Curated annotation (Swiss-Prot):
Cofactor remark: Binds 1 [2Fe-2S] cluster.
Any one of the GO CC terms: membrane
Keyword NAD assigned: yes
Source organism (scientific name): Staphylococcus aureus (strain bovine RF122 / ET3-1)
Domain 4Fe-4S Mo/W bis-MGD-type: 257-313
Cofactor dependence: [2Fe-2S] cluster; [4Fe-4S] cluster; Mo-bis(molybdopterin guanine dinucleotide)
Residues the entry annotates as binding [4Fe-4S] cluster 1: H95, C99, C102, C109
Enzyme category, top tier: oxidoreductase
UniProt xrefs under InterPro entries: 2Fe-2S_ferredoxin-like_sf (IPR036010), 2Fe-2S_ferredoxin-type (IPR001041), 4Fe4S_Fe-S-bd (IPR017896), 4Fe4S_Fe_S_CS (IPR017900), Asp_de-COase-like_dom_sf (IPR009010), Formate_Dh-H_N (IPR041924), Formate_DH_asu (IPR006478), MoPterin_dinucl-bd_dom (IPR006657)
Name under which the protein is recorded: Putative formate dehydrogenase SAB2186c
Residues the record lists as binding [4Fe-4S] cluster 3: C157, C190, C193, C196
Amino acid sequence: MQEHLVVTLDGKDYLVEPGTNLLEFIKSQDTFVPSICYNESMGPIQTCDTCTVEIDGKIERSCSTVIDRPMTVNTVNNDVKDAQKEALDRILEKHMLYCTVCDYNNGDCEIHNTMDAWGLQHQTYEYKEKPYEKDYGPFYRYDPNQCILCGRCVEACQDIEVNETIRIDWDREHPRVIWDNDVPINESSCVSCGQCATVCPCNAMMEVNMEGNAGYMTDTEPGSLAAMVDLTKKAEPGYGPLFAISDSEAEMRKERIKKTKTVCTYCGVGCSFEVWTKDREILKVQPSHDSPANKIATCVKGKFSWGHINSDQRLTKPLVRKNGEFHEVEWDEALNVIADNFTSIKEKYGPDALSFISSSKATNEESYLMQKLARQVIGTNNVDNCSRYCQAPATKGLFRTVGHGGDSGSIEDLEKAAMSVLIGTNTAEAHPVIASRMKRAQKLFGQKIHVFDIRKHEMAERADRFYQPKPGTDLAWLSAVTKYIIDHDLHDKAFIEEWVEDFDEYYKSLETFTMAFAEEATGIPEAELIKFAEECAKAESVVICWAMGITQQDIGSDSSTAISNLLLVTGNYRRPSTGAYPLRGHNNVQGCSDMGSMPDKITGYQSIEADDIRAKFEKEYGVKLNPKVGKDNHEMVEGVHDGEIHSLYLYGEDTGIVDSNINFVQAAFENLDFMVVQDEFLTFTATFADVVLPASPSLEKDGTFTNTERRIQRLYQALKPLGESKPDWKIFQAIANKLGFDWNYKHPSEIMDEIARLTPLYAGVSYERLEGFNSLQWPVHPDGTDEPILYLEGFNFDNGKAKLFPLSFDNYFKQDEVYDIHVNNGRLLEHFHEGNMTYQTPMIKYKVPRAFVEISPELAEDRGIHEGAEVKLISETGEAVLQVHVTDRVKGKEIYIPLNNDAMENGDLGAINLLTNSDVDQYTDTPSYKRTSCRLEVIAKRGKSPLNPNNFRVNKKRHPQYSVQVQKKWERPDYVFPGNQVDK
């Protein structure tokens, strides 16, 4: 194959790699060619025709031209300019330029910028208004009269996010963007990811919060606005002066609109973007092609759910309980109360009578200081975080087999794998941006997706193969598939020989895991498992993603281990697009654990029991550290009931709602001598506290998060803390100093420098290396090099070899005769966890106002109930009253309850964890949330649906197509390619 091709661009020769996009090459040489419909994150769409150039004497679109031969390209001759002007004129026929009074006049309107850069002074075709009104959804609106039909929104919806709602109806007299079968936005299958508004090159598709708020004159009434536009156009002879005025106004906006890079504070994907603020008002969230985890993608939460920042429910002053009621106090008083109580409890009962729970929503630096406060200042290892509730079993399984508790590679690897296997993960709702990458890979590039889940969620519907095992039985089929692969000589013998140990012992342990055994245990037909095993073994590359459907079982650690065993046997580690991906739930649950907020590990998973590790930290901290492993979250609650724990300090965690068996947890809170809660809001858990401290959310501080792919990213302060709230790191420092220590951090970067000194995984991390959209994936070496793909140099054991780990299985699913219904639970797309943050955004609450229970059509028929029925669910530990949504996403006696119950408004009413019990995974103490059974009593047989009728789940169907179907435009009788109009 020829290495380079000669391209002559405007008379100058260049050597270009074959396969290069011509438009991208032209741009790389700082040569201007208009390209309004083109976006580097989406590729050629071919609707605008503005990028025409002359290629070997013929006018063609440069965006869709691949350099596959030597070619001569001209971007400046008269024919090219005439063709480009024709295309630009046609755009202005559809789009009125009223830039100065347009909310989009912020320096990045691609129509304005293109016309200005090209030098267009007058348009040939008069603007023609279309017979359509604006269409408003809850978060964005569409203005057909400003739409140029570039199709970016369609490409984004169909082939980037792959939500498959938006398309262009090219058959109309006046084509326009439509939703589904031409219904209003708010009545469509749209999931409000907002990417259509992100990629729109003008003001046709725009965030509702932007409208009337961005410019100095954009809040003008429509009639007055039209008059201003007409007056301006009559006063100026051409577009040059108009652009000069609008450019000046756009420059003025920089004084009022602040653009700050941040990282999403919801799930573990780690989407980064700029947040646009005017004073405290959040105008929009704008992702970038430079965003390393998400590129231009977002979900409804990251794009639109920021109501919590300015919510009137925010805490703005410390609260101290006096005579049974909370009273606002000054910071010094609150800190004194904390210091006095911590001191007295420590003196009376010892340091291990105090306990600390860190937040997976807070920054790395804050998580580090929480564990430092516990270990250095108090002298206890009783510190933990919410990974105990979800991810600890996955980490345990990976520590056993490959040595690192994190994703094997990057999100990009998930997209490029030949086969993706999803086990117990509702990826489309819990990690929607990752799901979009997989959906795109399947739709456009043929990735095979296999889903194992008890519930038919979106990824199950889209899967090439969907398997429904009985609850809690995944270990059985995973081990049986692994045995079958070895038995039939399909395993990667060379990989195992070089990189894996304990094979013989492991293989012997598989003796009982026959396919017949797996079918009996799981209910999946043997033939289906055999076919999966053969496809898995033969696939060029395999990734396995899993989440709480695996980890929140009493055998979560063993099931996670079985996943890694299968990957090792098939040689699916140490290569791009292979490996294990335990999808982290919270934005910083990975980082919180990395930072040592764990009872047995200090930063970077260094053992607190190791003398040399303690010595290193003792030198830094200036105190002796407690060598005794502390209590985890589960043990803390038990410890309160046993009289061993007397104080609890937690922040950014609504433990009284999200822990299992919350009646038992809440009783523990009542038994504490002293409790401190630190949060944005007076959460349900905070109502049990003695002191409540007002904390600042992510937009009000600097710091770093570490996402599910081990990617460390900076977030920058966009707003001042509201009222007297403070960033968590400042609060920890104030408490430490009240207790006699001398913490003197001026900025979180100093905290990260300390972390890097003490933590090999983060040794090369610095704020300078994380500037802007730069990121690093641990382990980060002292010179700043990182490891996007783990294990390339060997596995994280002394000899560099992975370990196959023998397992057994006797966890058969048996339905109780009394508690005859199995309770599944998890997230919804619109809400995050219990919903404390998301319920503060009114339109999110409008879409999903409350928790509910999904019931199968067959169970509904059996119990004589209908949509909206009210039922009481009763388990061994408690009861919950919920409304019914009847759906085939669940089957038989399986039900599903979302986690969000708006506890700040409803308390624990309807909370799933009224039903869960205290059973845990034996190795990690992770609650068996998914191992819950109940019985059902009917209160009312029918009622109003718990879902808003405009929710996308209610009888809404997707409308898939490939791209914008531009050929339909080309087939219209009123279309002529501009290049064909040029008079040669």
